[in-house]
Amino acid sequence: MGKEKFHINIVVIGHVDSGKSTTTGHLIYKLGGIDKRVIERFEKEAAEMNKRSFKYAWVLDKLKAERERGITIDIALWKFETTKYYCTVIDAPGHRDFIKNMITGTSQADCAVLIIDSTTGGFEAGISKDGQTREHALLAFTLGVKQMICCCNKMDATTPKYSKARYDEIIKEVSSYLKKVGYNPDKIPFVPISGFEGDNMIERSTNLDWYKGPTLLEALDQINEPKRPSDKPLRLPLQDVYKIGGIGTVPVGRVETGMIKPGMVVTFAPTGLTTEVKSVEMHHESLLEALPGDNVGFNVKNVAVKDLKRGYVASNSKDDPAKGAANFTSQVIIMNHPGQIGNGYAPVLDCHTSHIAVKFSEILTKIDRRSGKEIEKEPKFLKNGDAGMVKMTPTKPMVVETFSEYPPLGRFAVRDMRQTVAVGVIKSVDKKDPTGAKVTKAAVKKGAK
């Protein structure tokens, strides 16, 4: 047995009709874990409904429908393998909460695959002022997705078909846009593909023999292996807390940074409750330690279920333990807010697993989105497309960290009017020590503070 392949997370972005589902579906279909029987069932249904155009998008539509109905589909369906990596598509867009998911997302994407519709009219719609191509690329960059692959899709439908001139024109325009966002286009492969016909997806296409670069599969293999933050102090935001008969209180969540293991003394922020971890489990198996990316349940001693809540963060009490934030300063980009945002604005922040109202107590500066340079001091308000530094005050105890130290706890979505109106990353946090924090007997025995 060789060394197990490295896991990477991919987010697929682009305008509504760019062919994201078809392209993603095609990869999963050809390289993935979808059972042949399931595919045959989908194909039969598609044929019955005369969806000739089915093929790959249909696969994804079925998966999405099942996912939205709350049927948890076998996550293997969203995975595929390249020569070097196991790839997971972390959120197929088109999903209502795509932006929110991308931010509070179950995981950080290692690479964004931007799908461009190369057809006449299609490309222009995607890149226009209202097109999602721009918004998604900006979002990916702001949230620290540093690597990107760009697919010029629907090359089978350009005029003339498989047109090099059209491809060149698109590259020029998209490069200049991605540069404005902050990416370096020289480092981005632009792969001409047809997600439907399969050109340059997995095998080289003879229709595109003027193109000498990598296929999509080869481009995925060329992604730089990301570093996982296991050497940082522990941060584990709680998703749920269960009471399990005969075992006791079991908080559940995903290790974002660091590691957790039995015998460790953990502190839960913001309350400061400190106790010992008795055991750590993943998929009903005991672990000696859990690392970043692992979704685990862990048993804690002498703690009532009511003392822990979703959004609390577990950390190692002896290694930079987490604390609640009195206030914090963030770099915010306003994305789709119809009016003006001034001091006193109080939306809801979605950050890791917490969902808490915060007040924009002070808009400090307006800045250039790309360079981060200050344009204006203490502006009266921010509006759509603006970026600024804002001091925020949570209305309830909340745990956040700076994006530079603990990325998953330092990026957030601002929600208002049932949509994401802004995104941001946290630059500094003013932390406060908890008062009257409970330390359990088990923790004292272990020599906690």
UniProtKB/Swiss-Prot annotation:
Binding site for GTP: 14-21, 91-95, 153-156
The tr-type G domain, residue ranges: 5-230
Cross-link (Glycyl lysine isopeptide (Lys-Gly) (interchain with G-Cter in ubiquitin)): K438, K441
GO terms under cellular component: cytoplasm; mitochondrion; nucleus; perinuclear region of cytoplasm; plant-type vacuole; plasma membrane; plasmodesma
Residue numbers spanned by region G4: 153-156
Localization in the cell: Cytoplasm; Cytoplasm, Perinuclear region
Cross-referenced InterPro entries: EFTu-like_2 (IPR004161), G_TR_CS (IPR031157), GTP-eEF1A_C (IPR054696), P-loop_NTPase (IPR027417), T_Tr_GTP-bd_dom (IPR000795), TRAFAC_GTPase_members (IPR050100), Transl_B-barrel_sf (IPR009000), Transl_elong_EF1A/Init_IF2_C (IPR009001)
A Pfam family reported for this protein in Swiss-Prot or TrEMBL: GTP-eEF1A_C
Region (G1): 14-21
PTM per Swiss-Prot/TrEMBL: Trimethylated on Lys-396 by ATX1 isoform 3.
SUPFAM superfamilies assigned: EF-Tu/eEF-1alpha/eIF2-gamma C-terminal domain, P-loop containing nucleoside triphosphate hydrolases, Translation proteins
Region: G5, residue numbers: 194-196
GO function terms (MF aspect): GTP binding; GTPase activity; mRNA binding; translation elongation factor activity
Gene3D superfamilies: P-loop containing nucleotide triphosphate hydrolases, Translation factors
CDD domains: EF1_alpha (cd01883), EF1_alpha_II (cd03693), EF1_alpha_III (cd03705)
Domain of life assignment: Eukaryota
Swiss-Prot/TrEMBL keywords: Cytoplasm, Elongation factor, GTP-binding, Isopeptide bond, Methylation, Nucleotide-binding, Protein biosynthesis, Ubl conjugation
Residue ranges of the region described as G2: 70-74
NCBIfam families linked to this entry: EF-1_alpha, PRK12317.1
PANTHER family (alphabetical): TRANSLATION FACTOR
Family: Belongs to the TRAFAC class translation factor GTPase superfamily. Classic translation factor GTPase family. EF-Tu/EF-1A subfamily.
Note from the entry: There are four genes for EF-1-alpha in Arabidopsis thaliana. The sequence of genes 1, 2, and 3 are identical.
Subunit (UniProt): Interacts with ATX1 isoform 3 in the cytoplasm on the nuclear periphery.
The name this protein goes by in its record: Elongation factor 1-alpha 4
Gene name tied to this protein: A4
